[in-house]
């Protein structure tokens, strides 16, 4: 699977490089399938209880993967309208976890997604589904101009979204 790196928004909690409290993750998309993937190794800062990753961190990473899957598919930035996460097994601190997300179906005003998070032994940590709402064209332009930190990145996103499946 050949992938493309997805752009970063400077202050984003998940991918932002300028957020001192952020996760600084690198998300990628397979341009042929629209499947988004991300790897994350939680640190002791992400503990919820006795060496287990906090469920909110798991949900946050899953949401980021699903919103990018919806954005790639819908060719516009999307916002989460609803997300359901089913936690199956605990994620352990300092052990890599992998998340993939894809689109189930897409309509002009609603994109349905799913995601799976697994550990390095392929054990399911969480499964999720979400409903994402694409921004209208004007708000999408404003969003792109506001959150992206430079013209080159803005042009990269515009080209990526034009090429999206």
Residue ranges and their predicted role:
Residues 1-5, 91-93, 104-165:
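HotDog/MaoC-like acyl-thioester-processing domains
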Residues 1-44, 144, 148-165:
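Non-catalytic linker/capping segments at the edges of enzyme domains
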Residues 8, 21-23, 34-36, 79-83, ...:
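A generic structural signal for short beta-strands and their flanking turns/coil linkers
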Residues 34, 75, 122-123:
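Detector for glycine-centered tight turns/loop "hinges" at secondary-structure junctions
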Residues 37-61:
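A conserved, well-ordered hydrophobic junction motif at loop->secondary-structure transitions
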Residues 65-98:
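Hydrophobic beta-strand-centered segment that forms part of the acyl-chain substrate-binding groove
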């Amino acid at each position: 699977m050949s992938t493309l790196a997805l752009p970063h928004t400077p202050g984003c909690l998940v991918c932002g490089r300028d957020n001192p409290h952020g996760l600084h993750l690198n998300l990628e998309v397979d341009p042929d399938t629209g499947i988004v993937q991300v790897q994350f190794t939680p640190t002791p800062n992400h503990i919820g209880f006795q060496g287990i990753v906090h469920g909110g961190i798991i949900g946050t990473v899953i949401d980021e993967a699903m919103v990018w899957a919806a954005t790639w598919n819908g060719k516009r930035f999307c916002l989460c309208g609803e997300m359901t996460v089913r936690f199956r097994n605990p994620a352990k601190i300092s052990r890599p976890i992998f998340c993939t997300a894809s689109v189930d179906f897409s309509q002009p005003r609603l994109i349905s997604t799913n995601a799976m998070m697994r550990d390095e032994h392929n054990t399911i940590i969480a499964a999720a589904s979400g409903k994402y709402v694409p921004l209208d064209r004007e708000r999408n332009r404003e969003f792109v101009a506001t959150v992206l930190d430079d013209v080159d990145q803005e042009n990269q996103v515009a080209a990526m979204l034009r090429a999206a499946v």
